[in-house]
Regions:
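A short, aliphatic-rich alpha-helical micro-motif
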Residues: 25-26, 46-49
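Glycine/threonine-rich flexible loop motifs
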Residues: 36-46
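Conserved acidic residues
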Residues: 30, 53, 77
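Short, intrinsically disordered, charge-balanced linker/junction segments flanking boundaries
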Residues: 183-185
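Short acidic, glycine/serine/threonine-rich loops at helix termini
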Residues: 1-6, 44-46, 66-71, 91
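Adenosine-phosphate binding glycine-rich loop
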Residues: 57-165, 169-181
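Glycine-rich phosphate/diphosphate-binding loop of Rossmann-like nucleotide-binding domains
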Residues: 1-37
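N-terminal Rossmann-like NAD(P) cofactor-binding subdomain of oxidoreductases
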Residues: 14, 35-38, 51, 58-67
Length: 185
């Protein structure tokens, strides 16, 4: 934790525990965030994590651990992958088009942290709202509601454009990088 060669942002997440492997690091961990390669996480590692762990296995096309294997390891695990065929698909398509649309709408000089945070907050708010029945039906379910299997909106949610892009545009205006101020509801 006190290492001089670790950036201050990373230092906050460092540990004083003597760990040298991923397996050791995951003991009691709340979150696994993987963007590496298939198979680096196994069921025993998931079982060693804290209660209700979040496993974000985002390697594509095959995640660090499959959704089914993670759920079989422990039913309380919350799993997100980059795959469309499982709950909680994490995909940059949820951000980039709407961040760019919001930036273009206000002729933003740059895309800053405030704009990215606005996009993240808009996605989080949308995930907590009631999902239209036709969208749920498109995924073969009667209902989608915020919880372990629905943390993030679906890529095909038609409400994304009307929520995320305006939030980004508003943040650009408020943070001073917008060159024009369109009507934002």
């Amino acid at each position: 934790r006190g290492a001089l060669d670790v950036h201050a942002v990373k230092r906050e997440f460092a540990t004083d525990r003597p760990v040298t492997t991923l397996r050791e690091a995951l003991v009691g961990a709340d979150v696994f965030l993987g963007v590496s390669t298939a198979g680096v996480l196994d069921a025993d590692m998931v079982r060693s994590m804290a209660g209700n762990p979040l496993v974000m296995a985002l390697a594509n096309p095959d995640p660090e651990i499959s959704y089914d294997e993670a759920k079989a390891a422990r039913p309380d695990v919350i799993v997100a992958t980059g795959r469309t065929d499982y709950p909680n698909q994490v995909n940059n398509v949820l951000g980039f088009p709407y961040i760019f649309r919001g930036a273009l709408d206000v002729h933003a000089r740059k895309i800053n942290e405030a704009m990215k945070l606005a996009a993240a907050h808009a996605l989080a708010e949308l995930a907590r709202e009631e999902v239209p029945a036709d969208l749920a039906a498109a995924f073969g379910v009667d209902r989608l509601e915020f919880g372990p299997d629905y943390l993030i909106p679906k890529l095909t949610d038609p409400r994304l454009l009307g929520r995320v892009a305006p939030a980004v545009a508003r943040a650009a205006v408020e943070s001073g990088v917008a060159q024009r101020r369109p009507d934002i509801e």
